[in-house]
A protein has these predicted regions:
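Short hydrophobic beta-strand element within catalytic cores of glycosyltransferases
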Residues: 224-227, 234
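Conserved donor-binding/catalytic core segment of Leloir-type glycosyltransferases
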Residues: 111-128, 133-136, 146-147
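Acidic donor-binding loop of glycosyltransferase active sites
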Residues: 196-210, 223
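A charged, aromatic-enriched C-terminal amphipathic alpha-helix characteristic of glycosyltransferases
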Residues: 4-9, 248, 252, 269-305, ...
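Nucleotide-activated donor-binding/catalytic signature segment of Leloir-type glycosyltransferases, i.e.
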Residues: 160-186
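N-terminal pre-catalytic "stem/leader" segment of glycosyltransferase-like enzymes
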Residues: 1-38
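Donor nucleotide-sugar binding/catalytic pocket of nucleotide-sugar-dependent glycosyltransferases
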Residues: 71-85, 90-107
């Protein structure tokens, strides 16, 4: 299969929600400069979703003369823009932030006291699965279980074949834990369809996210989120999750995550958290729906096209 990570999924949504007559006038390259050739007859855009510290970006961004190759730079978060501005002095007057979006806003699950507490984790395995599995080993309540969809398959067959062996010990550890169900890769459509089967999305990240599509999918579905404040997570998730403070001491972070899970499980049935989750869904529907993102993109693209071809 071809890659279908957040970058590919957001590009699919862009083409679904933004008129073709606008997109035909621009050339959008995602994240890695040069992946798509520059077209002198179009507005050339680098849609940057990768982090500033990725080795394959240094050659381009470290050479300020090369910044002129693109007409515009679009970043998926203010956090990401600020990092590129700070480390590479990118052209500020040709940079825009348009965050990722979602179109999945299902009727959320209402948790009732005594129901099983179901957790979901559907991030790639190098982003914090080790910490989460350590946290699950501390949880003794048999009513709390975790389903893990973590896999390298999301980035395609070639990526999986080259990298998956590194993470097989983690998969095996997950399979052996009594309160963890290791499921592995499922298409994004499956994840979205089943998101409301879950009560919490738990993500103790050890990877600097520039956004976090997995968290957005959970938040928009009314799922309670437990995460940390590493990278752009606090921007994507705003004030809605339970935050565990990031630390390089993974043992401490696992312990704090386990405590947060147990505490959250104890209040999921309370009226205050039900109201909280209702408001959470409203927030993400208002600010992160693809109806809104399409408006942002169309406004930007019209201006960029007019500037280049009508000047």
């Amino acid at each position: 299969m071809d890659p279908r990570g957040a970058t590919e999924l957001q590009m699919e949504m862009l083409h679904k929600h933004v008129p073709k007559e606008l997109l035909d006038k621009v050339q959008i390259c995602t994240s890695v400069p040069g992946k798509v050739p520059i077209d002198p007859n179009k507005v050339n855009i680098l849609w940057q979703k990768n982090s500033y510290d990725q080795p394959n970006l240094l050659e381009f961004f470290g050479n300020k003369e090369r910044h002129k190759e693109y007409d515009w730079y679009i970043f998926n978060s203010h956090w990401n823009y600020e990092k590129f501005r700070y480390f590479f002095n990118i052209p500020e007057d040709r940079s825009v932030v348009i965050k990722n979006g979602t179109s999945n806003f299902p009727k959320r699950k209402i948790y009732k006291k005594g129901d099983p507490v179901k957790l979901i984790h559907h991030c790639t395995p190098w982003r914090g699965l080790n910490v989460l599995l350590a946290a699950m080993q501390e949880i003794k309540d048999p009513n709390i279980t975790l389903d893990v969809y973590s896999s390298t398959q999301v980035y395609g067959d070639a990526f999986k074949n080259a990298n998956d062996d590194e993470f097989k010990p983690l998969y095996e550890q997950a399979k052996k834990l009594p309160n963890v169900n290791y499921i592995g890769y499922k298409p994004n459509e499956y994840i979205l369809e089943h998101m409301t089967d879950y009560d919490m999305f738990v993500y103790p990240s050890v990877f600097e996210e520039t956004f976090c599509a997995s968290a957005l999918e959970a938040l928009a579905s009314g799922v309670h989120v437990i995460t940390n404040n590493f990278g752009a997570l606090y921007e994507t998730c705003a004030e809605w999750p339970v935050y565990v403070n990031y630390t390089e001491n993974h043992r401490n972070m696992a312990h704090a995550t386990a405590s947060a899970i147990v505490t959250a499980a104890s209040y999921l049935h309370e009226d205050f958290i039900q109201e909280h989750l209702d408001e959470q869904v409203k927030f993400y529907k208002r600010f992160y729906s693809w109806n809104k993102k399409a408006m942002e993109w169309q406004s930007f693209l019209k201006g960029a096209i007019d500037e280049k071809f009508k000047a």
